[in-house]
């Protein structure tokens, strides 16, 4: 994958997250902001999830209260380079914990 393809795929991921949070109808207040290629999800309790792109590595990085994760594209899925878990699974787990209620991105 070249850099422009990586950015296109990351932009698609950012848009999917933003659209799902725009449709959020839970009790918790969850906000999403994109600034300079960094997506920040803010929760009512003040906690945040930070998602950014690492162009030199063609990775997506996820920072949560539980820790940091690095994802490589495998087929059509972003997969953690340590655990093998998918981006969506880890994002849902972190968002659910930080929101205090079930958050689904699917």
Swiss-Prot record:
SMART domains: Frataxin_Cyay (SM01219). GO terms for molecular function: ferric iron binding; ferrous iron binding. Keywords: Iron, Metal-binding. The keyword Iron applies. Disulfide bonds: none annotated. The keyword Iron applies. Involved in iron-sulfur (Fe-S) cluster assembly. May act as a regulator of Fe-S biogenesis. Belongs to the frataxin family. This is Iron-sulfur cluster assembly protein CyaY. The lineage of its organism: Bacteria, Pseudomonadati, Pseudomonadota, Gammaproteobacteria, Enterobacterales. The gene is cyaY.
